[in-house]
Amino acid sequence: MDPDSFSIDVAGRGQTTALVYRAKDPMGATFLLAHGAGAGQTHPFMVDISRRLAAAGVDVITFNFLYTERGKKMPDRVDDLEACWRAAIASVRARGGPTPARLFCGGKSMGGRIVSQVAASNAFPGAGLVFLGYPLHPAGKPKVRRDEHLPAIDVPMLFVQGARDSLGTAEELSKVASKLPRAAVVPIEGADHSFAVLKRSGGLTQEEATQRVVAAVASFIRAGLSTKRTK
């Protein structure tokens, strides 16, 4: 089934499109997912992950950042990216969407980094954050870190990270997460920043790697819902 769509008004900046992948057997949670710097919400990875999570019981909503919606390759300024994330959250909630206890947000690479900055600077109206390939540092520049703001986030965080990610390996992320009170890292053996695995590595197949990504996210969201219900 094709996803539904709706428009998001990013006040004073323009409009963008969101896609809704409805869960077949809903667990009662919504995952708002942003794309990375190099590809929009219709990239095969985004579509595949969204469909698989919907099959696992999670309602998934993706959206384009404004530069992607306009057909541009260069990402917007950080304040515009953050404004788009805030508008997406507000739009989902205004449409009669989930309460904060049932809303999870995250993104692939840059999309995740931007929502982490939003969550660190404001009271975050959600139950948790999911990062698919968090860009801890630029490729080849491990000392240029992007983790200074993470301790300010007060909701549970899940980092799903490839063991070969050139923007921060799972091992590097584990060291960061060990200093955060509510963070967990799920390493994907043999995977790079795009969660692609080497065909002749003798480790996980591509399908197995993708399944582990989806299972990690679904389990994190399910656990987050259970925690809220027991309080």
Predicted regions and their residues:
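Short beta-strand/loop motif that positions the catalytic acidic residue
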Residues: 152-154, 159-161, 165
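Catalytic active-site module of serine/aspartate enzymes centered on a nucleophile-bearing elbow/loop
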Residues: 199-231
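Serine-hydrolase catalytic machinery in alpha/beta-hydrolase-like enzymes
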Residues: 5-102, 192-202
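The conserved beta1-alpha1 loop
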Residues: 32-36, 133, 161
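Catalytic histidine neighborhood in serine/cysteine hydrolases
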Residues: 179-199
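Short gly/ser/thr-rich secondary-structure transition/capping motifs
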Residues: 11-15, 137-144, 167
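Primarily recognizes the serine-hydrolase "nucleophile elbow" in alpha/beta-hydrolase
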Residues: 85-155
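Conserved alpha/beta-hydrolase "acid-adjacent" motif
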Residues: 166-172
